Each structure stands twice: as C-alpha cells, then as structure tokens.
C-alpha cells in the first residue's frame, strides 16, 4: 500500500488542476459536516457536567388557557410539593431577578439567580474556586453570599482569584443588601436562564418579603428535583399529578379554571435540548446534502479522469495486474485526495463552529458553552475514509462486463461511465434544489421581518440602561435624579426629546409584567375572566422620544405627581376593546390581578385615563395588537430605568456626553448597553440572519458544485461525441440541431434532479415553514425551480456552443476524409 500511495502522490502532483478542485470540493463537504456534527454533539449528545444527570428533573407549571407556557411556582406551592412528594430526594429552587451591583469593578446591572441552600447539591454542580451556596446559607438571618458564574468571572472580572471574600452591594426590588463573594461556579449550561451571579435568599430583600414567602399566586421561581433512589421518572410524574390535583382542590382561588393550570416533569437534559433538536437535525441534513453533492461531483471528475486513463488501465491489465491491485491503486489516490480535503475541511470548520454556536444559542442555552474538542478531528477523518472508499469503487475496471473498454478507429469509450455520471448529476441537482429551496424560504422570511414597520422611530432613538440605584435613597430622590438627567441631556445639541421607561423594546422582551385588569363600564361575558394587559412605567415625553403619536388626550406632565389623582395612558388596542365606540378619556381602569393585591406595586385605586397612544409592541419583531396601561414614574414603582434619547444627530455621538453627565451626578450609577433601537431590533433578528446565512452558504456551495458537475458531464459527453457530431454535420445536419441535442441532454438531467428534489424536499420544506416564521414553502419551491433551471440551462448553452465548434473543427480536419468515404458508400 505504501508503494501505491507514493505512486498516487506522484500521479496527483502531475494533475494540479484536478487535484486542487477535488481537494477544495471535499474540504467544503467534510468541513461543513464536521462543524455541524461538533455542534450537534455538543448540544444533543455530549453529557452534562451535572452529577447523575439522568436523575435530575425539571418540574414545570403552565397555564395554557392563559397562554402561559411557563407560569413558574410560588414558595407556598413549592412547600406543598416538598412536603408531599416522596419520589424526589431533594428539591432546588431558582428564581431570576435584576440587581444593580456596586463594589465589584464598574457599577453594573446584573441578571441574578436566587437559590435555596440545596440548589447546587440537587443540580450536582461543583465550584472551580471557593465554595457554593449550601444549607448553612439558608434562612432570613443568614449572611448574604454570592457565587459568580464562570462566564461572568472570565469575561467581566478576567478570572481574578482575589474576588473571593470581597463584598458587593446588591440593589433590587425591595431594597439593598450587601453580599460576600464566596465562590465561582464551574462552566455549565446556564439553565433556566443565563445569569451573571447566583445569590442566596438572604441577599434579596424581595425574597424575604411576606408576599414572596406566603402568597400562593406570587409565582416567579423555577423548580428542580433529584429522583430518590429506586424512583423512576414515570413514578414521579404520577405522584406529582396526584399531589398537584390536591393542591388545586385545596386552593381553588389560586388556580383559574380558564387558565387550565397543569404540571409536567422532564429530565433537565431533555428540557435543555428540546428547542434545538429539530433545527439541528435540519442543519445536519443540510450538511449531509452538501457532502452528497461534493462526493457526487468528485465522483464525476474521477470517472472522467478514469476514461482518460483507460489506456493505462488496459495496459496494466494486459501486463497481469489483478483487479484488486487496480482497485488498491485507485483507493490510494482517493485516500490522498480525501485526506487532504479533510485536513483543509477541519481547519475551516474551527471558525464555523464559533459562528454556528451563536446561531444555535437561539434554540438552546447549551450552545453558549460549546467548545471545540477532538470530535472535530475524528469526524473529519471518518468522513474522509467513507468518501475515499466510495470514490475508489466508483470507476469500473477494464474487466467489468458492463463497463468494458471498446476501441474503434483509435478512439476509446467507456460505456458504463456515462450512465453513472448522469446518476451523480441528478443526485447533485436534487440535493442543491432542496438546499436552495430552504435558503430561499429563510431569506424571504428575513426580508419580510426587516420590512415590517414597528411604529417607532428606531433609527434616531438611543436606548441606554440606567437602572434605578436606591442605596439608601427614597423613591422620590431617584425620580428627582431621573428628572435632572432628562433636563441636562435635553440641553445637549441635537437632542430632540429625552425620557425614561422600564422596558427597552425587544432587548428586554419578556421581562415586563402582564396583569389582569378591568375598565369602567366593561362587563365580562359569561365565564370570561378579566383580560390581561402589559404594565409599563414611563416619564413624561416617553411617546415623543420614541416617535409614537398620542391619538387622543394628553401625555403625562409635571402635575401628575403622587399627591394628585392617579392617572393612566392606555394603548389604542385597549381603548378599542374596553371602550368600543366610546371616548375613553376621563373613564377609569383598575387592576384586578391577585398578585397586585398582595404585592401592592401599583396604585390600589382606579386610574383616570388621560390619553390614548398608538400601540407599542416592545416584545415581538412583527408588531401585534397590544393592550398596555402606562403609569407615570411619579405614581408607579421604579423596576428599572431605560433612558431614551430622540436625536437629529448621530445617536452614537451622544454616548460620551451622556455618560459624563450621569456619572457627574451619581458616580455609582450603572450606564450600560447604549445602542439605537434599530440595532436592538437587528440583534433580535440576528438568528434569522444566521439562518439565512448558514442555509444560503450551503445552498450556494451545493449549487455551484452541481452546476460545475453538470458542465463537466456535458463536456465529457460532447468530447466523446465529437466524431458523431462531425459525421452528422457532413451528412447535412444543422448546427442548431446539435445545439438542441446537447441542451435537451442537460435539461433532462436538470428536470430529473428537480423532480427528485421536489419530491424528497417537500417534507423538510414544510418543517422549515413551521419552524421559521414567515416561510412559504410552496411559493419558494416554484421560484427555486425556475432559478435552478436557469442556472443549469446556462451551463448547457456553454457546452452546446462548444459542441458546435468542436463539430466544425472535426468537419474541417482529418475526420472530413472519413466522412467523405461514408458518404460515397451511402451513395
């Protein structure tokens, strides 16, 4: 075999054009598959770092009747489950809350997890530095302690080991607390949500409040459990349903029949990967199609090269070379080609993995921690071996009956090769058609999303996170600080309007509360519960700052203080639903959500409507009719601060002066994530862009390879039929007829490939249409058919023109003498 490899290397070096094309083609196919398999393995196959992950269960409460996929749990509900369910040895709870953290580097707003003392033991996680939160850190009298996540420790604190033992001030809902950094968590999947820090309950005043501890409807906590020894998941599910049914019976006021509260349990691993499984398998299928196209194209090139080497093979056979020796020689060449292609493909796959990990993080948080390991190498090697074996057995040897070499007048043809080449071409066309159809659907969906009007002036609005920092301040003092910030920023050149809100559109999607309410004069239908609406706290000028018109009434003003009448502004959709054919101005709305009755985070009395504003959907990229009630920041609680600046200048030129103004007023004030609303929207659209880019690149590569493959087959066919074309010209056939023959041969292969692609690609297309919003598979398939046909017909025309020129040259050369003899014999 060593001798064969040496001979093969010399042979390939003598054909640099052929070798380069084959290596690059294989590198594209192998690299794409190696990168995507690494992604699939990292997200779907690779074990979690959690100890005994198969016994780690995620317990979810949902309310499908209210459109709530995950309603989370309240502490009384968790207490009932802990007391009654015996299938779990222990439970761990996790809730998410926003903190302003001061004292650990720059002031910043962090997303924090709040856990009980058994959480890390249940999750089976370990520290890389210090220790984790344990039972000794439980209870309201415990000292505040914090564990840093590995990503935050690495990116924000540069892996500084001296942070252990330092104290930070955590400000949030309910007040401020100091907490000591006690450890750094090992790299792990950030589920249920990515956080920067994880604190004990004593670090969050809100979690110590009576509302959090005693109210059954105050739901904000995720629940995990570890199966008890000998217990199975099915047994745990049965017990959970039984206990949950008893809980609903004992507390009917907390479980609305219309909301249809339900309980479910799933292994944490399955829960983490469920959203990514379908899209990753589609991605893997797309990469497999690219590999098929690449191998088919290389097979065609090898077949054409074998025909040119048929004399050599015949001589070797005549000199006694066995079929196994010939096949071994071909295998040596294939191994060298595929090995070089795999090496180049693995190198290119390394940067592809980083891009694909960001893409997959939309569907599974596990992709955030994806790293490149040895699997990339062995996948590339395995694909190279598979391709080498396939390609080595593609050519038929001289002794094959169906592919025997025939000689006639000094020319040779391989009768079996042409049929195989056509099969490979049809395969390439079909695969490229499926990929192109999928890419077309995704691009169409992306363009539709980008063209959607938001109702806001997104390009000229700068949004900056300026969260409320109390740290001993009262609500009135924070409001006064915000007012002064607005006044000073509006004095800057180019600033049109400045205001505060609590939600940055799209960037903070899902963090704003949705609450039940009712309106003066509105009567619920039989069995209808009170409707739900978004709740937002804003400053005067908010609508002008975002470029949103006030349709009726007025905006908030300085007179709408806490000592005055409680007022509200409502959205246009809410006005139409709650006050049909009526003027809502000076009517009243009031909150009825049971959560608000115990938390008292909104004014308890009815609010008089002073204005109606156009809808603002700050959650969805494609705006939907949205019911919203707005409170003035002087009359409502300050959950967080988002600064909006409407400018006629370049929005980003204001970041430095705005930062200087705010820091000059409050050195401890976090100032983060400055960017236009247009960029915030583009960030949300980035997964769709990656969808289009990934599948578009696959489709472009496959189509390019396939078009080259068709052109190669037709070129081979034309060169093999040069003598035939010359004779037909001599006998009176027109060049246009030869042109049509070549065109029809290519069109037949293209049609067969498109039909095969449409048949086998319809189901994946339907899946893609359901998975990616805005895709229409039927229309895209029709358009792609035309595009693929046009691409292949262009290649056919080039080869047809070449056939006519070849035939004319043949006619005017020595072949002309043969043609004259043939004509004389016929006469």
Predicted regions and their residues:
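Alpha-helical transmembrane segments of integral membrane proteins
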Residues: 1-19, 268-273, 301-328, 332, ...
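Alpha-helical transmembrane segments
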Residues: 28-57, 353-361, 431-460, 715, ...
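Short, strongly hydrophobic transmembrane alpha-helices
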Residues: 16-43, 47, 293-296, 342, ...
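Membrane-proximal extracellular/periplasmic loop immediately following the first transmembrane helix
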Residues: 48-98, 218-224, 363, 453-516
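Membrane-helix entry/capping segments
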Residues: 1-21, 49-50, 106-109, 141, ...
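Interfacial "coupling" helices/loops that link adjacent transmembrane helices in transporter permeases
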Residues: 294-338, 708-750, 754, 808
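Mid-to-C-terminal secondary-structure elements
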Residues: 98, 113-135, 144-281, 355-358, ...
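Small-residue-rich transmembrane alpha-helices
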Residues: 36-39, 299, 335-403, 444, ...
